[in-house]
């Protein structure tokens, strides 16, 4: 099968490597490279199957500038919420392509370990279960794939866990110990589920690979960019310097503002996200911790 991966960052490169095991693959590049597997955006749009691994905040602009109403089937591997429109990825892509040609990839998966061909399990969500199964068949045997109808739940989990990973990184950056991190992540899972309930996401999604699985991975490892952002914030650095030092995109930073705006709009109780936003804006990490410890909790 011919598949083009759009986005040549770490995640896009890892997906290209995995999908190349069983398929004829190419990957887009924004720079001139003398490598046969790199193709231009125009060439990529000629492929029947596309896998998007772009930074979430850049996807709408990419679609406006490049997308033509062809018959591609698309797997979205980007995790985030568009900050300008406060739309989830299915809504962003839905402006350009029908939902029966869209699937979404989620689950615990560090790009570096996928490149090392270490085993992992992922979820492919979509309204068209035949297409989900088709995309699932493209992956090699060291990546176990499941399918799901709960697009919104998978999207919320994939976006929200990045913000919770920032909070977890702060916790570890302050050397508060394993008990504190476990408490924070557990409360974060409850908060993420509460947010998802408003959007009619399915409860089982939050307890599976897309939810608890991805959250526990991202919130407990220095391989996570968002976790490293939190750890740096705990040391007293401002977010501008943290991101310069990181040198990579940390989706959780922009996603925190998007979730915060949505929670205010719909009056959803999200204390951890609220404190992450305040820390991004300069609030002392210790003060945020104290406020979280004294905040009310609707569900334990």
Curated annotation (Swiss-Prot):
First-tier enzyme category under EC: oxidoreductase
Reading the lineage from the top rank, the first entry is Bacteria
Is Iron a UniProt keyword of this protein? no
Note the InterPro entries from the entry: 6-PGluconate_DH-like_C_sf, 6PGD_dom2, G3P_DH_NAD-dep, G3P_DH_NAD-dep_C, G3P_DH_NAD-dep_N, NAD(P)-bd_dom_sf
Gene that codes for this? gpsA
SUPFAM superfamilies given in the database record: 6-phosphogluconate dehydrogenase C-terminal domain-like, NAD(P)-binding Rossmann-fold domains
Q: Which positions are annotated as binding sn-glycerol 3-phosphate?
A: 79, 107, 109, 161, 214, 224-226
Query: What taxonomic classification does the UniProt entry list for its organism?
Result: Bacteria, Pseudomonadati, Campylobacterota, Epsilonproteobacteria, Campylobacterales
A single GO BP term for this record reads: carbohydrate metabolic process
- State what protein this is by name: Glycerol-3-phosphate dehydrogenase [NAD(P)+]
Q: Which organism is it from?
A: Campylobacter lari (strain RM2100 / D67 / ATCC BAA-1060)
Protein family membership = Belongs to the NAD-dependent glycerol-3-phosphate dehydrogenase family.
